[in-house]
Amino acid sequence: MSRTSSTVDSPQKDAGSAPSVKSNGLPWPLQDHAAVSAATIDGLYLHIPFCFHKCHYCDFYSIVDAEHAPGEAAEAASQISGHSPTSPPARAAVFVDRLIAELTELARLFTLHPRTLFVGGGTPTLLPADQWRRLLDAMKGLGILQRVREFTVEANPETVTLPLTQTLVEGGVNRVSLGAQSFQPALLATLERWHDPASVGAAVRTAREAGITNINLDLIFAIPGQTMATLDADLDTALSHAPSHLSYYSLIFEPNTAMTQRLKMGQVQSMDEETEREMYAHVIERLAAAGFEHYEVSNWARKESSEFKVQSSELRNQPSATDLNSELRT
């Protein structure tokens, strides 16, 4: 969905490659970590790849098909963009089947009692509520949720509905990360983001109504056509929503993305380095003045609510990649 998030950046591999398996039966990324099978996994990342649109800057693994949007999200998206995704696909159920099977195996191999759990994408909130219930119930049954202190789900603003958010809260989700990116329609159009800027505020209100008060906003600066004035306007709007956390990334022209192709064709121009540095410095200054702790390059948390932890181990599970990393900050 977006180049996010506040706590976890997911690794990407060739979407066409399947993990190789050695004689001990573990996928290749886990071969060198078999010795930690008795250790506790402190952080877990799950990847839900479905999207109904590929944003031009995004290089994350995703499956783009209008059929992936469930009914309520489809209606919201069609009102905003004129596109009309259809009802939930059967493949969502198949995906959840396989994800549950893999989590079951991982729970057998590792002590899978994470303190932090992050579900990214893709657009995780395109999974229908019934599939979310299946996944959450399975994780509860496997004991994965018993030690979780922070359970984040990534969402595009237009997919946040009260029934779905209530389902997530009932399953233990206590944090949402919203892909706002910008509040300027022209800049959203440059990024090929379909949502209405007003949908971010609506999503924040919906999350809070459902009981989620820990809210992150993802934003991007150094967007082609952005000025210091529009950057300030984005900061003003973001802060008006009183998030507990902000992730602010500079736009990266990743290889093999539509944005990079547009750059090569002269359709967009990248920000000059000096202006980009000035924008970053301005973000740092504004957020410090607003009471945010700058604890990582692109991440800020409110000082009164921040909790920083260094993970001893984190397991990332997603289509085409499984990875175990050490000493990651969340």
Residue ranges and their predicted role:
Residues D9, D14, H83, N317, ...:
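Intrinsic-disorder-associated, low-complexity terminal segments enriched in Asp/Asn/His/Tyr and depleted
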Residues H47-S62:
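Local cysteine-cluster metal-coordination motifs and their immediate loop/turn environment
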Residues M1-Y45, A73-A77, P85, F110-L112:
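N-terminal [4Fe-4S]-dependent radical SAM core
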Residues A76-Q79, T257:
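Residue-level signal for threonine
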Residues W28-G43, Y61-E72, S87-A107, L112-K309, ...:
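C-terminal scaffold of the Radical SAM
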